[in-house]
Amino acid sequence: FAGSLLEFDQVKEQIAGYTKTVVGGERSRSLVPTKDLLEIVTRLQETSEARQYLEIGSGLEFGPDQDFRELLQRALLGGLLRGEELFAVRELLRAARFNRTELGRQVEVPMLTGISENLPELSDLERVISGAISPAGEVLDNASPVLHNLRQEVRQAQNRLNEIMERNLRRLQRAEVVQEPLITQRNGRMVLLIKSEMR
């Protein structure tokens, strides 16, 4: 087989080293030689356009360097995605939108423009995720009205508790009962440090 004479496996491995994503590396390693003239011409034209596109200083965005297949399969089956996973999906959508827009402006690379037109337009989903998930993967207050109200109630209750603890601390300080003038937490509870002889 001519592929072994050309050290095709080593060539594929070298190409994979230049890819930006896990999936891109896998696709590079799975390349097989072809005798189909139309496919050869098409791939050469795509490669030529990609080179031309990069030479004019433009670039592409790839989003997070992770394999989204398992994550998307889980979502398709109705599974839950963690906050950081949702934000990674948002970054992938943002990159796809950028590439679609950027390549759509380039008349010199019609094949790449055609490929970019196959990227789905999901800016509404991107916007929803952006409004609900922080870059750290935390669910934002405005993810839903119910969550917003619940978190507001929790903050108000926490503020009331802090005020009560501070009043008690001042009162016990005047009575010289506290060991240190601070409020700490033990086992998730707010506590005042009382002098051992006063317990």
Which stretches of residues belong to each language-model region?
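Conserved amphipathic alpha-helical "coupling/scaffold" segments
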Residues: 1-154
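Extended, Lys/Arg-enriched charged tracts that mediate electrostatic binding to polyanionic substrates
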Residues: 148-199
